[in-house]
Every structure is written in structure tokens, then in C-alpha cells.
């Protein structure tokens, strides 16, 4: 699915280091502003332990995870909305993203310069939010006269005009559009930056990762958005190990149970409004990506459009019921497998076999 998460942040916040670790790519990560100019795109697997279990049950030869796409975008600076730094390029790239992941520097390292001369997470978050709001103000101010003209001949878009005016008022008050009650569908065509869902990644050092008071302070700063805490440099070192046992030992030493990258991939997937259903057989156990709220025929169409066109029924068992039963035959004997029709809304973790007529 063509949905992406744009990784943004001030220069030297750790964006490219995080992206390198996420995608296991060696993207340029340098200690100077704008080391990234053109956005780098990486497809990241979403960790899902259910696939390994399914592979055991069905004797699958391989597993295929769902994926989420991250884009590493040039560092933003104050004045970006006026074209400062690489502002115009930054804003055009982030406008294309479906959600935003802001990397905020918490770690202190004299060898890594800060664009403003001091580490201040609240100030950094405020800088980027201000630039996004200013950019959206420009967009909405241009859109309203156009919408006013268009409504004279098309009353169907009056609601869009009113939503744009509400957005203008919110932005002038310094409020991101996503924090309002505006129907986002009515302003979707404007591609407003502050209407996108947000994830905040706080790039910490080892001591800060164990400081619950600091983490709670950061969570409160960005609530209700998701806050993830990790050490991008450490995560990069974990990836370089290539040894799961050694990686687990390093994580245990840090006092964490799983890599921050795994958390980010899952949270990113969820933030995009996505979920998975599962299929399994001797060839592969696979997670398929669908939007939350997708119907069974729509889910079938992800495999092949012909499956959606010729959809008849879906044979479904929940993952938990299947694993508890031990096999598909035992799940059927226990009455846990059911047939669902065209109106069925898929649940995350449904194990499915589609029946269709070509």
C-alpha cells in the first residue's frame, strides 16, 4: 500500500542514523546540517511473532512479514516555511508522506553539534511544529479564496470551505489541525502538514532511557501522540551484530525487552491505520496489509484483484483459536472456523482462506 512515514527532525537529531538502522542501509549520516537532501526511502519489515508460529503449524518453508515504508527527509530549521535552509524542498517532501515521525534529540554529546547551540527537546519540537503551522497557514490562506469562488457553482463543497476556515482559525491560534475536531476528509485535498498523524522518537543515551521521570515529561509534551524512546546509535550497533543471541544479551544489559526499531515499525504501521490478516500453507506463512475496516472482499483483492471480483466466501479462524487448537483440522472440529461473506469486516490476526470464482 502506498503509505509512507516521513522521518523529520532538526539537523543532527539522529534521523539518518535511525533510518540506517531501520533499513539496514548505509545512508550518509554526517555531523553537519543537511547531510540528507533528497529523501531516502526504505521498506521495513513489521515484526510479527505470529508468523513463526503459523509456519510451525503449517510447515511453511518461509515467512513473509508486512512492511511499512519510511522516508528520511532533510533536516528542517527555523524559517523553513520561508524557504530557509532546504525549507521548500523539505516541505514538498513531507507533504507527500502519510504520517510524520519526528526524531527529537535528548542525548548530549559535545562532539555532535546542535543547530541551536543547546539540547532542548521542547524547543526542538516547537520549532518544527511552528514551521509546519506556518506552512499550512500559507496553504489555507491561498485555498480559501479559490474555494469561495468554486462554491458559487458547486454547493457540494461548501463544507470544504467551512472546514478550511476552521483550519485557518486553528492555525492562527497555533493549533495543529489534527488536534481539532475538523473533519480531516474535508481538508484532505489541501495536504496540510499538521493534519497528518504524528509519532515522536526521542533519541536518548543509555542513562536517559532508564530515567522514567524524564520519559514521562517527554510523553506529556507530545500527548496524545505516540512517544518512543531509543538510542539510535545503539540500535544501529544492534543491527550490525547480525547475531540474535548477542543482540538479546545487549538489550538485557540495557534493561529493555526488544529493540526500539521493532516498536517503531509496529507503531508506524498502526499509525498509518493498517492491520494484517494472515495466510499459511506449505509454501509460506504471510501477513497481508489492509486498512483497518477493510471488508473480506477488499482483503482478498490485496492478494489479487480477481479474488475480489470473484469473491464467494472467506474461511476464517482467529490466530489465537488456531494456535490453541494446534491445527486447522482441530480448529474446525472445535467449531472455531467460520465462513464469512461480503459484508464481513476483517479483524487483525484473522487467518484466512478465500473462496472465489474466476
Where are these regions (language model features)?
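C-terminal-of-GTPase-core extension/linker across diverse P-loop GTPases
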Residues: 2-8, 13, 19, 146-345, ...
Amino acid at each position: 500500500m502506498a503509505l509512507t512515514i516521513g522521518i523529520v527532525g532538526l539537523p543532527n537529531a539522529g534521523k539518518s542514523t535511525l533510518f540506517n538502522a531501520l533499513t539496514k542501509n548505509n545512508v550518509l549520516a554526517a555531523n553537519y546540517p543537511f547531510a540528507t537532501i533528497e529523501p531516502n526511502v526504505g521498506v521495513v519489515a513489521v515484526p510479527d511473532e505470529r508468523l513463526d508460529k503459523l509456519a510451525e503449524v503449517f510447515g511453511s518453508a518461509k515467512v513473509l512479514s508486512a512492511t511499512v515504508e519510511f522516508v528520511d527527509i532533510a533536516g528542517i530549521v527555523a524559517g523553513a516555511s520561508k524557504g530557509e535552509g532546504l525549507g521548500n524542498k523539505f516541505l514538498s517532501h513531507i507533504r507527500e508522506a502519510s504520517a510524520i515521525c519526528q526524531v527529537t534529540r535528548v542525548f548530549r554529546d559535545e562532539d555532535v553539534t546542535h543547530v541551536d547551540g543547546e539540547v532542548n527537546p521542547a524547543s526542538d519540537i516547537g520549532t518544527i511544529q511552528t514551521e509546519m503551522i506556518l506552512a499550512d497557514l500559507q496553504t489555507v490562506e491561498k485555498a480559501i479564496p479559490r474555494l469561495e469562488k468554486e462554491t458559487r457553482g458547486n454547493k457540494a463543497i461548501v463544507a470544504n470551505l467551512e472546514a478550511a476556515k476552521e483550519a485557518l482559525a486553528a492555525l492562527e491560534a497555533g493549533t495543529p489541525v489534527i488536534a481539532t475536531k475538523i473533519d480531516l476528509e474535508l481538508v484532505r485535498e489541501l495536504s496540510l502538514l499538521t493534519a497528518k498523524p504524528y509519532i515522536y522518537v526521542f533519541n536518548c543515551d543509555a542513562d536517559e532511557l532508564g530515567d522514567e521521570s524524564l520519559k514521562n515529561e517527554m510523553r506529556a509534551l507530545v500527548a496524545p501522540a505516540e512517544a518512543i524512546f531509543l538510542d539510535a546509535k545503539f540500535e544501529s550497533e544492534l543491527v550490525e551484530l547480525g547475531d540474535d543471541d548477542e543482540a538479546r544479551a545487549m538489550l538485557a544489559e540495557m534493561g529493555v525487552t526488544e529493540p526500539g526499531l521493532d516498536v517503531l515499525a509496529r507503531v508506524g504501521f498502526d499509525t498509518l491505520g493498517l492491520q494484517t490478516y494472515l495466510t499459511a500453507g506449505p509454501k509460506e506463512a504471510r501477513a497481508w496489509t489492509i486498512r483497518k475496516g477493510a471488508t473480506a472482499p477488499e482483503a482478498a483483492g490485496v492478494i489479487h484483484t480477481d479474488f475480489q471480483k470473484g469473491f464467494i466466501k472467506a474461511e476464517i479462524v482467529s490466530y489465537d483459536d488456531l494456535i490453541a487448537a494446534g491445527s486447522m483440522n482441530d480448529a474446525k472440529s472445535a467449531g472455531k472456523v467460520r465462513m464469512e461473506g461480503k459484508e464481513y469486516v476483517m479483524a487483525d490476526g484473522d487467518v484466512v482462506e478465500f473462496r472465489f470464482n474466476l
